Structure formats: structure tokens, C-alpha cells
């Protein structure tokens, strides 16, 4: 009885070892076989080959190594499954990025669109400086010319009046920034034209002509009048004889003799 049991156990062990040897045999594709299979999949559009196609493909691949029909079938099935999984991962990652961008858009200080960055990266001016508008007479705006990123900055400022106001007050932005390329010849740059400057210059020229005309008329009118001196030459004796003395009864006032004072009054009254 025991002998029969041992025989049965020996038969079971032999069957298990056979199954293990059979399952351990795996297909190890060569580089040439993988190259041909990928060429069929990507370039020839073979996704789900038929049984006849599998037989012909396996017969072709046996020239480069050991292979069976089931190996060809499973290779196509696994390749399609990996491709579908890759597409799902890409779609999930794209959806996650879109959700992150949408959530960041709800918080303005964390994210800005490229248009907003371009909008807020322009040159700004100091709100504490108040300059009159270019249309006001006799006032020129501030013109600043600079090039960014090249290490040089040239500024030209021309103004007559620029008042300083406390921060937060109203101001007029009269600053103009003009980018300059240092690699271009500066002599070939055409000068900028300012229409309001030409208007101010014309008005200033008209005012200058009016002032010159008034001065000429004034000089012409003065030449027709006779110049009279305050103290005529023939009255020098009166001035020389004029003396000042202190009188005790005058209350501290200085006065001259009566004759000299009368002569001085006649001289002064002779002028219109």
C-alpha cells in the first residue's frame, strides 16, 4: 500500500516538473524581429493581423530566431494595449494642466496671461512728479530716450517748469520712452518732429516782433521830446548856496534860508 502511494507521489512530482519546464519557456525576440514587427505596425498599418497573416509573419521572422505564431499574436495585442495606455496618460496629464491653469486664473496675483505681462511691463513714471501738458504755452514736456538690455541709457530732458506734488495727487504723464538700437548708426536716424514745439516757436516769434515794434515806437516818440534836466546847469549857484542848518525852534527839522528855498521852489515849479 505504501509502495503504491510512493509511486503516485512520484508521478505527481514528475508532472509538476514538466509543467514548470513548459511554462518557463519564453520567447526572447531578436532586434531584427522587433524591427520587422514595428515596421508592420507603424508603417504598414497592421494592428490586428488575421490567422493567415500571423502564419506568414511568423514564417518570415523564423529566419532571424525562434518564434511561434502565438508570439506574433500576443506581440500585436500587447503593443496596442501599451499604445492605448499611453494615450490615456497623455489625456489625463493634459486635463490636469488645464485644471491647474483654471484654478490659478481665479487668483489674479498668482498668474497672469502673456498679454497682461506685456501690458504691465511698460515704463512707468513717478506719481510724485507733476508736469504740465504739452499744450500749455511756454512749457516743454520731458523726453527720455533709452535702450534697454544694451547697457547704455541716453536721456534728453527739455523742460521749463516741472512742479513736485505729493504722492497720490493728480499728474500728467508727459514722459515718452523711445527704444534705441545701439547697433544702428545714430546719424542715419531721422530727427523726431514735435508739432506743438513748432506752434510754440511761431507764437514766440510773433511776440518777439511785437516787443521789437513797441520798443521802436517808444524810442521814436522819445526822440521827438526835449530832454530836460532835473537841476539846470545855470542854477548851480543856487545848489552851491543851498545850506542846511539846524534851528532850535523848528522841532529838529533841517531847513535852508528863505531866499535859497524860494529859488529852489521856482526852479522845480518851472518843469511841467
Curated annotation (Swiss-Prot):
Location(s) in or outside the cell: Nucleus
Protein name: Protein WUSCHEL
CDD domains hit by this protein: homeodomain (cd00086)
Region entry Disordered, spans: 1-24
Tissues/organs with expression: Expressed in the central zone of the active shoot meristem.
Bias (Basic and acidic residues) ranges: 1-11
Cellular component GO terms, alphabetical: nucleus
InterPro entries referenced in this protein's UniProt entry, alphabetically: HD, Homeodomain-like_sf, WUSCHEL-like
Annotated GO MF terms: DNA binding; DNA-binding transcription factor activity
Major place of residence: nucleus
Residue stretches in coiled coil: none
Entry's family note: Belongs to the WUS homeobox family.
SMART domains assigned to the protein according to its UniProt record, in alphabetical order: HOX (SM00389)
Pfam families xref list: Homeodomain
Function: Transcription factor that plays a central role during developmental processes such as early embryogenesis and flowering, probably by regulating expression of specific genes. Required to specify stem cell identity in meristems, such as shoot apical meristem (SAM). May induce shoot stem cells activity in order to maintain the stem cell identity.
Biased composition (Polar residues): 12-24
